[in-house]
Amino acid sequence: MHAQDKGGILPALSLLLIAVAMVSPSQAAYKLQERYSWNQLDFAFPNARLKEQALASGDYIPTNALPVGVEHFGNRLFVTVPRWRDGIPATLTYINMDHSVTGSPELIPYPDWRANTAGDCANSITTAYRIKVDECGRLWVLDTGTVGIGNTTTNPCPYAINIFDLTTNTRIRRYELPAADTNPNTFIANIAVDIGKNCDDAFAYFADELGYGLISYSWELNKSWRFSAHSYFFPDPLRGDFNVAGINFQWGEEGIFGMSLTPIRSDGYRTLYFSPLASHRQFAVSTRILRDETRTEDSYHDFVALDERGPNAHTTSRVMSDDGVELFNLIDQNAVGCWHSSMPYSPQSHGIVDRDDVGLVFPADVKIDENKNVWVLSDRMPVFLLSDLDYSDTNFRIYTAPLATLIENTVCDLRNNAYGPPNTVSIPKQAAPGHSAVGPPLYTTTNQYRSLLSQKPQTSWGPSLPSRNYLPALNGNPGIPGSRNNLNNLGAPGQVVSSVSVSTNTVGPSGIEVPKAYVFNQHNGLNYETSGPHLFPTLQPAPSQLGGGLKTYVNARQSGWWLHQQQG
C-alpha cells in the first residue's frame, strides 16, 4: 500500500500541482469573495401585507431599483439606491450582517422608513448616492433632493448634508447647501470626509460632476464654500467614449467625480486626489487649500496635474488606506485597480487587484473599512440605463476581501522587493508665473509607508513578478476549481457572454434618451406633485384607521410606527 502511494499517487499529485501553478491569474486568482448578490433588490417591509400593497400600487417596483453605493460599519453594510425611477421605497438602506451572513438579504431602510420619504425635505432623504462613515462613528450622506434621471429629473428638495450618529442611529445634523455652492447644472454623487485633530475638526468635500466644481464643508463652522470652474474639474474631450458590457456609449460631459484622501502629512494636512469621469488622468490638491474659504478664487496653481493611468482607465470611485494604498474601479475593464502613493503616478506603478468579466461588470463603488477590509459593489449600471437587465440572472453583487490579500503580488505590494519605490517622490506646489512657491510641497513621501508594510515577516512576501499594468482579459474556464462564479455559460476566451440583449445606442428602455451618467440636475424649479408616483400622500390618521397600505403607513407619523419596523 505504501509502495503504491510513493510510486503512483504522489507523482500524480505533483503533476497536478504543477498544472495548477501554470493556470493564469486571470483565470483562477479570484481574490475578492462574493458576499451578497441579487437578481433584483428586495426591501424589508414591516410586514407581508404592506409589501403586497406596495407592489400592487406601484410604490415598490423591484426591477426599477439599482444599488450604487456601499459602506461598512460594525455589523451593518449600508447600500444606497437612488430614486431614478418610480417604485423605490427607500434610498438609504443597510444589511444586518449578523442576521444575513450571505445570500440575497432584504434591504432595511436606515434609520427607518420615515427618514426615506421622498420629498419630505426637512425630515427625510430623497436620493442618496455614495456615502461615508468617518472614524468618529458618523455616517455622512448627501441628499441630492432629486427624483428621476436624465430628462425626467425633478428637484423636490435642495442639496442637503445629513450626518447620523451610528451609535444612537439618529440624525445629528442637516445642512442645506446654499445657492452659491451650486449652479443650474450641478450634480453631486461623491463625497470624501477629512478628519483632522479631533472629531470637530472635520471637513467634507463634494465633487460637482456636471457643474464642474468642488465644495468644502466645515463641521465646526457649519459652513460651506465652492471652488469653481478649475480646468482640472472638466472632462477630457478625448476620453468621453465608453465601452462596458458590449455597450458603446458617450459620457463626454462627465467631470470631477472620484476622490480619495491621503493619510495626514507632516504639515498636518492631507492630499485630495480626484479624477473627472471622462478622463484617464488624476489631479491633486492639498486640503490646506480646500479648508481655507479665502482661497476659493486664488488657488489655481495649487492644483496639480498627474500623469494618465493608462488606457481604458475611466473611474468613478476611489479610496485610500491609512498606509497609502489607493484602490479604484476601472469600469471599462471590469476590474479594481491599485496605486501606492509612495510611487510615481505612472502606468507602470498601477496594477490590477482583481478582475471579473462577469461579476465585476461596472464595479460602481469601492470602500476600505475600519478593519482594512475592502468592499466592492458591482451593478451593471450601463445595461440598466441603456438596455435591459435580465432579472433571471445575478445583476448586483457585493464582494469583500482583506486589503493585504488584494494587493499581494501586485505592483502596490511594497513588501515585495521587486516593487521598491524610489527614495523620494515629491510634487512641489506649482507657483504662478513670476512668483516663488511658498508653503510645504503638495506631498513628500520619503518611504513613509515602507516601515509600516515591512513590519510583516519576510515569509509573507510574495514571489517576484514581472511588472505589468493590467492583466489580460478573463478567459472562461468552467473546469477551474474554486472559481467564485458559475462560468459554464462562457464562450470563447476573452468573450463576455450574457443573456442580456445589449445595444450600442443611448436610448433607455422607455425610448428616453439617457446621454448622462447619472441624474442631470437642472435645479429648474419644477413643482413637485405631492400626490405623484414618487411621494406618499399626506394622511393624518393612524394606520389602524386607514387601509391605504404603505402610503398610509409611512405618513401616519404620530403613531411612532417607524420604531417597530419588524412587527407584523
Curated annotation (Swiss-Prot):
Record Gene3D superfamilies: TolB, C-terminal domain
Residues spanning the signal sequence: 1-28
Keyword Signal: yes
InterPro entries, alphabetized: 6-blade_b-propeller_TolB-like, Royal_jelly/protein_yellow
GO CC terms: extracellular region
Superkingdom assignment: Eukaryota
Keyword hit for Secreted: yes
Positions glycosylated per UniProt: 151, 222
Location relative to the cell: Secreted
Family that this chain belongs to: Belongs to the major royal jelly protein family.
Protein name as catalogued: Protein yellow
Organism (species): Drosophila madeirensis
GN (gene name): y
